């Protein structure tokens, strides 16, 4: 794909889908917290994006902010692309923000729509949600709040077959894709405004390296860094470019057993990952005795040398 010709992140997904038609029945997204058989194919993801987009378009004007508060899961990517396809701007929130941060962000961005994963996340921000803001949930937990599942079911019954062959082609590279707020450790969180073109440029830079490293036609990612972080948020579009299979880890604590299940061929990492890995290895090392322990010590010594 010639990225310089792509105008938006939405176009990126749909053009990749068209480019590799055989993808449609390939496994694309899988959350390791759910049943082993629960996965989404490229076709299902595309279908859900289109259905959710139709609903969001009825409630959004171009540039309206949409808060997305959720742990990493397949619905995160679906909601993100659906928001942008409907002309909105995604405002991803960390699930670990302080109450003060949540209050500030909601006042600052004035979201038109708030997509929340479950009751736990909803309770964190409930009192900061304006009466003018429409709340949508990923999981069913409140009869007064419409869920994505209900929305998809309703729209699937409508005569909307035409939308599945097209996307919003009015989005330009200069248009705002998302606003990612800093953690607020040095005062109030600062909203970083990222355009479609800016993120696409980062993807282009990443591909210059990854295309040389990823020899496999179907690379496997294990995503564990928060998608609300600008780094991992960009990576999800690199995953699309590579036509990868994506597993979402349960948590940092379960990262190693999740790696054994997903068998990733590529992962994004930060110092915290290596620290966690080193700690686990050190704990196992301390339990070893005799010749096995001496062999490990020799290996470490040679590695350092």
Predicted stretch roles:
Residues 39-43, 177-203:
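Conserved AMP-binding A3 loop
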Residues 65, 71-91, 95-99, 107-113, ...:
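A short helix-loop-beta submotif of the ANL/AMP-binding
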């Amino acid at each position: 794909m010639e990225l310089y010709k792509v105008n938006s992140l939405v176009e990126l997904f749909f053009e990749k889908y068209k480019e590799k038609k055989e993808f449609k029945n390939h496994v694309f997204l899988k959350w390791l917290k759910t049943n082993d058989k629960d996965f989404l194919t490229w076709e299902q993801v595309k279908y859900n994006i289109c259905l959710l987009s139709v609903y969001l378009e009825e409630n959004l004007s171009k540039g309206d902010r949409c808060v997305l508060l959720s742990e990493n899961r397949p619905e995160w990517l679906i909601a993100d692309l659906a928001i942008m396809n409907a002309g909105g701007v995604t405002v991803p929130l960390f699930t670990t923000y302080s109450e003060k941060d949540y209050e500030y962000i909601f006042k600052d961005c004035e979201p038109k729509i708030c997509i929340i994963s479950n009751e736990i996340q909803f309770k964190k921000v409930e009192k900061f949600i304006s009466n003018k803001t429409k709340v949508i949930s990923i999981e069913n937990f409140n009869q007064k709040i419409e869920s994505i599942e209900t929305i998809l079911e309703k729209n699937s019954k409508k005569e909307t077959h035409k939308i599945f062959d097209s996307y919003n082609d009015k989005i330009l590279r200069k248009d705002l894709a998302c606003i990612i707020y800093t953690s607020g450790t040095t005062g109030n969180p600062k909203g970083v405004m990222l355009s479609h073109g800016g993120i696409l440029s980062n993807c282009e830079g990443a591909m210059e390296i990854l295309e040389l490293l990823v020899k496999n036609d179907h690379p496997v990612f294990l995503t564990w860094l928060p998608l609300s972080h600008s780094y991992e948020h960009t990576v999800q579009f690199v995953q699309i470019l590579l036509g990868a299979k994506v597993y979402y880890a349960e948590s940092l604590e379960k990262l190693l057993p999740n790696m054994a299940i997903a068998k990733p061929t590529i992962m994004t990492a930060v110092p915290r990952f290596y620290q966690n890995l080193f700690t686990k290895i050190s704990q196992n090392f301390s339990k070893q005795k005799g010749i096995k322990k001496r062999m490990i010590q020799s290996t470490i010594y040679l590695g350092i040398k």
